Amino acid sequence: LVLFLGLVSLSICEEEKRETEEEENDQEEDDKSEEKRFLSLLPSIVSGAVSLAKKLG
């Protein structure tokens, strides 16, 4: 559970960093691709959390 929360926190920090860079560059196409990339990471994070929860069960 701690690992899962750490991964979520790290993902949120990385996403905020990406958003800041995108605003500075003001490139709309880059914004869309970064959002898709972040969303594509969510299934892995959830899968890892479920696996960890089963082990700790």
Swiss-Prot record:
GO terms for cellular component: extracellular region. The keyword Cytoplasm does not apply. Residues 1-13 form the signal peptide. Expressed by the skin glands. This is Phylloseptin-Az4. Belongs to the frog skin active peptide (FSAP) family. Phylloseptin subfamily. It comes from Pithecopus azureus (Orange-legged monkey tree frog). Residues 14-35 form a propeptide. The gene is psn12.
